[in-house]
């Protein structure tokens, strides 16, 4: 049996792409992505529920983000779910969930 970690999302970027350049020449792009779902509540009203996802990309994919993905751009991505942690300035362990993007498709919009 093959186990797979694969995420596919379509949504709108919520901020400008943040770039980090590493000493070894590699680059990292970070951006948030909003996806929305709708449901009907007990009063019969349609309610929109938005989820925010943290995306990271490296290398050529990061360069595509930098050049072609402004705030508010509709994109489709494929990648894998990743988890990491760090200790903040007060020594408290913080946990981060991110999607490491392997493929990006630029869609309509801005």
Predicted regions and their residues:
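Single-stranded nucleic acid-binding surfaces, predominantly the OB-fold ssDNA-binding core
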Residues: 1-110
């Amino acid at each position: 049996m093959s186990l797979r970690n694969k995420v596919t999302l379509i949504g709108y970027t919520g901020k400008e792409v943040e770039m980090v350049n590493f000493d070894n020449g590699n680059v990292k792009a970070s951006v948030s992505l909003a996806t929305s779902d709708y449901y009907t509540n007990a009063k019969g009203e349609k309610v929109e529920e938005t989820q925010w996802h943290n995306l990271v990309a490296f290398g050529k994919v990061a360069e595509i983000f930098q050049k072609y993905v402004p705030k508010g751009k509709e994109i489709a991505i494929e990648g894998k779910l990743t988890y990491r942690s760090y200790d903040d300035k007060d020594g408290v362990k913080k946990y981060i969930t991110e999607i490491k993007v392997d493929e990006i498709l630029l869609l309509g919009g801005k």
